[in-house]
Swiss-Prot record:
<comment type="similarity">
    <text>Belongs to the RNA polymerase beta' chain family.</text>
</comment>
<dbReference type="InterPro" id="IPR045867">
    <property type="entry name" value="DNA-dir_RpoC_beta_prime"/>
</dbReference>
<dbReference type="GO" id="GO:0006351">
    <property type="term" value="P:DNA-templated transcription"/>
</dbReference>
<keyword id="KW-0804">Transcription</keyword>
<keyword id="KW-0963">Cytoplasm</keyword>
<dbReference type="GO" id="GO:0003677">
    <property type="term" value="F:DNA binding"/>
</dbReference>
<dbReference type="GO" id="GO:0005737">
    <property type="term" value="C:cytoplasm"/>
</dbReference>
<dbReference type="InterPro" id="IPR012757">
    <property type="entry name" value="RPO1C"/>
</dbReference>
<comment type="function">
    <text>DNA-dependent RNA polymerase (RNAP) catalyzes the transcription of DNA into RNA using the four ribonucleoside triphosphates as substrates. Forms part of the jaw domain.</text>
</comment>
<protein>
    <recommendedName>
        <fullName>DNA-directed RNA polymerase subunit Rpo1C</fullName>
        <ecNumber>2.7.7.6</ecNumber>
    </recommendedName>
</protein>
<dbReference type="GO" id="GO:0000428">
    <property type="term" value="C:DNA-directed RNA polymerase complex"/>
</dbReference>
<comment type="subunit">
    <text>Part of the RNA polymerase complex.</text>
</comment>
<keyword id="KW-0238">DNA-binding</keyword>
<dbReference type="GO" id="GO:0003899">
    <property type="term" value="F:DNA-directed RNA polymerase activity"/>
</dbReference>
<keyword id="KW-0548">Nucleotidyltransferase</keyword>
<dbReference type="InterPro" id="IPR007081">
    <property type="entry name" value="RNA_pol_Rpb1_5"/>
</dbReference>
<keyword id="KW-0808">Transferase</keyword>
Length: 386
């Protein structure tokens, strides 16, 4: 059976285009040629699809809220968990779920899962090289001691030669990095650097000390640590900190699979659709880690609502809850007096189009049997057949 024949059979089907394409590809891949068998598969797929559709008038938002909220009451309040790697902590459980729905700009424990391309993923040495290129290195991380020398009126840095070697750096590299960031005179005595300023004073030296410690030497900003872990037949990197844009530029990184738990960062770098998928994945993973199962369609409902305006918005008074069109709905959620005062001053009119506002005024809601109107001809006469 050819693709054209399948397309003709599926032409009038109620199945969505993506499902039609996947079904056609599966039938062709399995080499099914018997027409009766193909017809039966299409019929069964259509029946299964129709069974998954929502009944008209179903309160999908309420059901989604219940389905996520009820298992949420069983989630632990534990903030940290060892994610298979003893050295790294990530936020899980209820605190992580709150972070996701609040659309926090920065998670409490940002982390990345970095996959390597075919050339690097099977070789430990190459994976280690990529990790070194990613891990952020500053002056403090390659020094044994950084302190103010009161006698010589300078900042003294004692470099650790082993740390320099392991990170692929030399003393001249450190000197060059310091000079590019600060105007200082540097005296070099093997692994000891003396940094002098024009008008030395204890206050001036102490003010510069934290800046000297933080000078970036190598790697990706914000990536404090990178752990290498072998899973099945490939090496995967786990990072403490997140900077997906710069990590994508590192040689050896597979940009098609690498991800981060920072949803706002995904939105900024990869777009709103990627952020939507990340919300669904992160919520599902957080619930799954606690042994809880929630139908993905409930999670998709939340993700769609958060991303509907093209930017990730929190669910709460500072996001979706505070932007409802209805004044009464906004007032019923939080900050009741503030919303009612504001609406009164501006002369707003509530159209009573939603659920909450109709319940407040005692009208039937447009849900379930309330969303159906009975239409009848006014000229109908008793005894006359319709």
């Amino acid at each position: 059976m050819q693709m054209a024949d399948l397309e003709k059979k599926l032409e009038n089907s109620v199945l969505p285009p993506l499902l039609k394409r996947e079904l056609s590809e599966k039938i062709l891949k399995d080499g099914l040629s018997e027409e009766y068998l193909v017809d039966e598969i299409i019929s069964e797929t259509t029946r299964a699809y129709e069974r998954t559709l929502v009944e008209p008038g179903e309160a999908v938002g309420v059901v989604a809220a219940q389905s996520i909220g009820e298992p949420g009451t069983q989630m632990t309040m534990r903030t940290f968990h060892y994610a298979g790697v003893a050295e790294l902590n990530v936020t899980l459980g209820l605190p992580r779920m709150i972070e996701i729905v609040d659309a926090r700009k920065e998670p409490s424990t940002p982390t990345m899962t970095i996959y390597l391309n075919d050339e690097f993923k099977g070789d430990r040495e190459k994976a280690s090289m990529v990790a070194k290129n990613i891990e952020s290195t500053n002056v403090e991380s390659v020094s044994e001691d950084i302190s103010v020398d009161l006698v010589n009126e300078c900042i003294t840095i004692i470099l650790n030669s082993q740390q320099l070697e392991s990170r692929g750096l030399t003393v001249p590299d450190v000197i060059e990095a310091i000079k590019s960031k600060m105007k200082l005179k540097i005296d070099d005595h093997e692994n000891v650097l003396n940094l002098k300023i024009k008008t030395p004073s204890l206050k001036a030296l102490r003010k510069r000390l934290p800046k000297v410690r933080a000078i970036h030497l190598k790697g990706v900003q914000n990536i404090k640590r990178v752990i290498i872990r072998k899973e099945v037949d490939e090496y995967i990197l786990y990072s403490e900190g997140s900077n997906i844009k710069e990590v994508f530029d590192i040689e050896g990184v597979d940009t098609t699979k690498t991800t981060t738990n920072n949803i706002v960062e995904i939105q900024d770098v990869l777009g709103i659709e990627a952020a939507r998928n990340a919300i669904i994945y992160e919520m599902d993973a957080t619930l799954g880690n606690q042994g809880l199962t929630v139908d993905k369609r409930h999670l998709m409902m939340v993700a769609d609502l958060m991303c509907t305006d093209g930017v990730v918005k929190p669910i709460g008074r500072h996001g979706i809850g505070g932007e409802k069109a209805s004044v009464l709905a906004r007032a019923a959620f939080e900050e009741t007096v503030k919303h009612l005062y504001s609406a009164s001053m501006r002369g707003y009119v509530d159209e009573l189009g939603g659920v909450v506002e109709n319940i407040i005024v005692g009208k039937p809601i447009a849900m379930g049997t309330g969303c159906i109107d009975i239409c009848i001809d006014k000229t109908y006469e008793e005894g006359k057949e319709l």
